[in-house]
Regions:
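Pocket-edge structural micro-motifs
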Residues: 45-47, 136, 199-201
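Glycine- and acidic
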Residues: 1-4, 67-77, 92-102, 140-142, ...
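Active-site core of glycosidic bond-cleaving carbohydrate-active enzymes
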Residues: 1-25, 106, 162-217
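Helix-terminus loop motifs that line ligand-binding clefts
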Residues: 13-89, 95, 102-106, 115, ...
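Acidic/histidine-rich catalytic neighborhood
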Residues: 114, 118-161
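Short, glycine-/Ser/Thr-/acidic-enriched flexible segments
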Residues: 8-9, 50, 94, 139, ...
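Aromatic- and histidine-enriched alpha-helix N-cap/loop-to-helix transition segments
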Residues: 7-10, 78-89, 107-110, 149-159, ...
Length: 217
């Protein structure tokens, strides 16, 4: 989210290499999603060798919860899932910055498609609100555990539906087909336009979102 836009201006090929790395991580990301009971690809919070998947330790070494006597879990490993939407958003940024159709055909389209599949399976329909919830996550502050409808996470998943509004939608047929599949993944879950994106405030000031979404308090 921070490095790729800079590289896109300074050296677009480096920006594309960053996403080719994510593409190399796809098999492991698909295994991670499947292990959690989801479809598509769930990209890791901490990543190293592409085939290794998420290298985040399961617990904090040497730390014990005094209340339970158990090792303190690192919940970011499973719950900080906005990374998957971040990858999809980065693909879109590269397309906007380069209009490299070969890159999109070889790498970008599949990254978008598998990200869409993950979010479609991760979101839960809320009959009362008539929208989709994304429950039990950690936002980019890395401290707010077990959050429901974290503003940044939900907004990024919502932004992943940019194809309805973008010029990209009208580009070449092969790429357009992928984007229709991206949107269609959400249509399977009743309505592609409804995901809970209300923002939460503390003391009349937005938190977390102010940093990552540029919302003024």
């Amino acid at each position: 989210m921070f490095l790729l836009p800079a590289w896109l201006v300074i050296d677009p090929e480096t920006a594309k290499r960053l996403l080719r790395y994510r593409y190399a991580c796809l098999p492991a990301a698909k295994r991670s999603a499947e292990a959690g009971g989801y479809r598509g690809a769930q990209f890791p919070w901490e990543s190293a060798q592409p085939e290794a998947g998420d290298v985040t330790p399961a617990t904090v070494e040497g730390w014990v919860d005094p209340a339970t006597g158990r090792a303190v879990p690192i919940l970011e490993k499973t719950d900080e899932i906005h990374i998957t939407a971040d990858v999809a958003y980065a693909v879109w940024q590269v397309w906007q910055g380069t209009h490299d159709e070969a890159f999109m055909a070889d790498y970008g389209d599949e990254l978008l498609r598998e990200s869409a599949r993950f979010w479609a399976s991760r979101a839960q329909w809320n009959e009362v609100k008539q929208c989709y919830d994304i429950l039990d996550v950690i936002g980019p502050d890395e401290y707010s555990e077990h959050s429901d409808n974290n503003a940044y996470t939900n907004w990024m998943a919502h932004v992943a539906r940019f194809v309805d509004l973008s010029d990209f939608y009208d580009e070449r047929a092969a790429i357009r087909t992928i984007l229709l599949q991206f949107r269609g993944e959400f249509r399977v879950k009743r309505n592609p336009n409804r995901i809970f994106t209300a923002f939460h405030f503390e003391n009349n000031r937005p938190f977390t979102v102010a940093i990552f979404l540029g919302i003024e308090s």
